[in-house]
UniProtKB/Swiss-Prot annotation:
Binding of NAD(+), residues: 78-89, 289-301
Record-given protein name: 3-isopropylmalate dehydrogenase
Compartment(s) where it occurs, according to its Swiss-Prot or TrEMBL record: Cytoplasm
Subunit structure: Homodimer.
Organism this protein belongs to: Zymoseptoria tritici
GO biological process, one term: L-leucine biosynthetic process
Amino acid sequence: MPTYNIVVFGGDHCGPEVTAEALKVLDVIDNSNADVHFNIQPHLLGGASIDAHGEPLTDEALAAAKAADAVILGAIGGPKWGTGKVRPEQGILRLRKEMGTYGNLRPCFFASESLVKTSPLKEEVCRGVNFNIVRELTGGIYFGERTEDDGSGYAVDTEPYSRAEIERVARLAGFLALAEDPPCPVWSLDKANVMATSRLWRKTVTDVFANEFPQLKIGHHLIDSAAMLMVKNPRALNGVIVTSNLFGDIISDEASVIPGSLGLLPSASLTASPDGKSKCNGIYEPIHGSAPDISGKGIVNPVAMILSLGMMCKYSLQQPELAKKIDEAVRNVIEKGINTADIGGSAKTAEVGDAIAKELEALLK
């Protein structure tokens, strides 16, 4: 029976509320016939860590995360900690950098067909949307040299990218596309008509797929036309989307509104391709923030957090059947109408979590 070491960062505000529901799901698996055991290690991150330790991420918590099989994160940040010298966001940036989570995965899909009506897009436009955005997470403009405005009214950000960085994330996208049944197309987004780094990006991605994934379809879109296409005909992007840090940050937020609630979509940030040959640690978290306006009210949607567990089982733990069971349990509960207010229901956070745990327990018998 494999035992997996899982570090849990509840984080701030509604973060601990959703991780509490995730732990219910892990407890069900732990006590089922799945022959899987979890060693849960809770630690502080973000504002909670600042309050307790004066820093957003302690060396002890970082070491635990790096040594773990996977990391679960609720959400961090909030107005209490402002924009001062020590900020919650510094903790997650350090965590990503030190763990080396170079690939951020944000799938866009409907957890249940019944949710199509919650989308801001027309049903005939969004029905059948199913793509996975792979964002390069540790390079690009967020990590380039910068010059702050010193009062002169002038500032500079630079976007560096190396061929090796682009090759690595392109291979991750190719692996994910190849793992689908049947293999799906890959869409690379750039701004090659203007930016030198984008021209390097396009050439490198083209070379990787020609040499290493010749059986896959690879297409290229300029980021601005892709942003338009995502609203006009998002199914045209079904498959795997791969793009740079900045473009991925923006386009994944655009995609996040398609299912109708931020509380529905999971994410993963991976340290390696999940090929089963080497360790693939990852940070698994919902795409929503800490939502201080609703924290403590018991109304935050735990679905995104629980679906993130499914991604954890699929990628870091190499337990694809468990991942399918988690997704199925979530779908069944949504279709039974046990939903939080953001998707038209009246259930509380804990009620949804309890229902999913109970459904999963039945599926694992």
